[in-house]
């Protein structure tokens, strides 16, 4: 009987998309472009909402926090993915891997709760417009935002702690582009049954409950839209809410398929593609869907741009004169 390699793993190697060697350069350009657009779009939202006088309603407070979250959420995984595409296999230390895992779970859970509260906010704004200022005031909005962040922070601790206590011996190659829960549990040489059950229950508690809390208000919104007598008003409102619902469904659908209902028959490469949707694609779509289709927000962007351009012009003119 051959002796088993029980040496403790101190670092991991992320394999990424090594089976697509001929597409590495193209994938790098695509992911880099998406990452840059995501950062720019969300930073624009944060800047415009903080400076726009008409954008201080609860809806835009939620949006500002969502954009701030998306910047960090996508930065947790994408830079390492880009480095992986350039080096064909990125090494990451054990502590850095656990840190990435924690921030991924923490920010992902926070986004779930934020999306649920934003759906409730949209429900009140559309279905109870006259009572909306009294029901969703800035104090309540601030408390809901704090609840989202605090719940996300606490949610990230348990999975990260349980994974960090597992033994990793011998193999250190993670068949993924970031330190995710399923591939780490597959790599461990410990018994992971309790860890799997705990993460499964936690995934149901966060993903499924938040999904139904997000979906519920949109059901009432759709029924309210169908009662709007104006065809143009109904079409415009339905288009906006339909876009929100499409992005929410994409985000939750891919997450649930990975953590609540994983298929043992799916190839690791398919799981990586599914992961791309909730780590790369949805952070890009959120600023487009929630803000750039909004008339008030686009007007605020134009005002901020005119103000910034005016300041730059006056500064350059003053330097030229002196």
Curated annotation (Swiss-Prot):
Q: What is the lineage of its organism?
A: Eukaryota, Metazoa, Chordata, Craniata, Vertebrata
Q: Membrane-crossing residues?
A: 26-46, 55-75, 100-120, 140-160, 198-217, 238-258, 272-292
One CC-aspect GO term = plasma membrane
Positions in the Extracellular compartment: 1-25, 76-99, 161-197, 259-271
Query: Under the GO molecular function aspect, what terms does this record hold?
Result: G protein-coupled receptor activity; odorant binding; olfactory receptor activity
Stored CDD domains: 7tmA_OR
Which protein is depicted? Olfactory receptor 11L1
According to its UniProt record, where is this protein mainly located?
A: membrane
Keywords attached to this Swiss-Prot or TrEMBL record, sorted alphabetically, are:
Cell membrane, Disulfide bond, G-protein coupled receptor, Glycoprotein, Membrane, Olfaction, Receptor, Sensory transduction, Transducer, Transmembrane, Transmembrane helix
**Protein family:** Belongs to the G-protein coupled receptor 1 family.
Q: Which residues are connected by disulfide bridges in this protein?
A: 97-189
Q: What does this protein do?
A: Odorant receptor.
Which Pfam families is this protein grouped with?
7tm_4
Glycan-carrying positions: 5
Q: What is the source species?
A: Homo sapiens (Human)
**Which residues face the membrane's Cytoplasmic side?**
47-54, 121-139, 218-237, 293-322
Subcellular location field:
Cell membrane
